[in-house]
Amino acid sequence: MAARVLRARGAAWAGGLLQRAAPCSLLPRLRTWTSSSNRSREDSWLKSLFVRKVDPRKDAHSNLLAKKETSNLYKLQFHNVKPECLEAYNKICQEVLPKIHEDKHYPCTLVGTWNTWYGEQDQAVHLWRYEGGYPALTEVMNKLRENKEFLEFRKARSDMLLSRKNQLLLEFSFWNEPVPRSGPNIYELRSYQLRPGTMIEWGNYWARAIRFRQDGNEAVGGFFSQIGQLYMVHHLWAYRDLQTREDIRNAAWHKHGWEELVYYTVPLIQEMESRIMIPLKTSPLQ
């Protein structure tokens, strides 16, 4: 319809010109001009339908989405362990990591430590919080370089690993801060690779969506990456067992408004992954 309207207008305008000018001199040029003009207008109209407009932002999303009252920084570690070494790896982690957590000279807290049950096998996941942001992280790293027990632990650990990676994260302002909880629980870490430029939209939608997922106290924490793999979001949930997880997730679909928020957040995702994790005995999150 729009294309036919544009062509009709172009033809009428061109016809008026032809009546006032010599047909031999103007006709070829007018045909070329009206054809290219119509195509460009039609292309512009079509682009307006399919190209999503992104509003300009006046601040970094880390400032817009993170908690203002704290300067906490989180480190998420993924360690892929040799299958035959997992038991020994867990043993040395449970001996050394709690000592760092309990030492008041280290401005950091071990939030949780797990083995992946479903997902990447023979994997350990550790979540640390640094009270004071990047300066606290630097202070801890410098002190650990002088900690002989930790250096021995790191050397022994390196012989047990196949690979490892980490990310530095900030917490969403609308999520609970992770606090120790009693068990037994299983934990789900849902990780989302977002499309670049969509973090603000994700935060806006989930600021409303989180209220649908707090009835069972299952929401542990929500984070977004600052260093490492960027535009990554991690949601951490706690459930009594897998059946409880299934029941809680199904119940959300019966709450008015949940399906609409899911509808709008799904297009923001490039890739997603779910890990079901079991806490180690020394994990503050049980």
Curated annotation (Swiss-Prot):
Q: List the disulfide bonds.
A: none
Location comes to:
Mitochondrion matrix
A Pfam family it matches: NIPSNAP
Gene3D superfamilies listed in its UniProt record:
3.30.70.100
Tissue expr? Widely expressed. Most abundant in heart and skeletal muscle.
For this UniProt entry, the molecular function terms from Gene Ontology, in alphabetical order, are: protein-macromolecule adaptor activity
Q: What does this protein do?
A: Protein involved in mitophagy by facilitating recruitment of the autophagy machinery required for clearance of damaged mitochondria. Accumulates on the mitochondria surface in response to mitochondrial depolarization and acts as a 'eat me' signal by recruiting proteins involved in selective autophagy, such as autophagy receptors (CALCOCO2/NDP52, NBR1, SQSTM1/p62, TAX1BP1 and WDFY3/ALFY) and ATG8 family proteins (MAP1LC3A, MAP1LC3B, MAP1LC3C, GABARAP, GABARAPL1 and GABARAPL2).
Q: What does the similarity note say? A: Belongs to the NipSnap family.
What is the official name of this protein in its record?
Answer: Protein NipSnap homolog 2
